[in-house]
Amino acid sequence: MFDPTNYNELTVTESSIPGLFVIKLPVHGDNRGWFKENYQKEKMEALGLPSFDIVQNNISFNDKTGATRGLHAEPWNKFISTANGRVFGAWCDLRKGDSFGRVFTHEINPGTAIFVPKGVANGYQTLDDNV
């Protein structure tokens, strides 16, 4: 089960793939569960996240550990997070340039989001049931 006590400060950190950012989200928990601002434009841009337009909003659900999706690359940016459980995320830069073929991996849980720039492939495998 996700423990929100370790997620109290918003941070935005660029990964080894240029333009791909790891976002640590403040999560506020109590006896009812937890709450988070999944995306807050002004705060995140002030910390270095690029401005982007929402082109499409997708939600996926996987009932079993080990479900794998990807790798997918679309001609738009992505903002990825989970509402429950953990996934092992993997990204590969498909853009022409010095970072072509570079791979980055990171675990995502409800306190973590990833900004994926267009041209970078995205995939994940669930580490828990009901993600």
Kindly label every feature range from the protein language model.
Residues 107-128:
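Conserved metal-binding segment of the jelly-roll/cupin
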Residues 1-108, 128-130:
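Non-catalytic, conserved peripheral segments adjacent to functional cores
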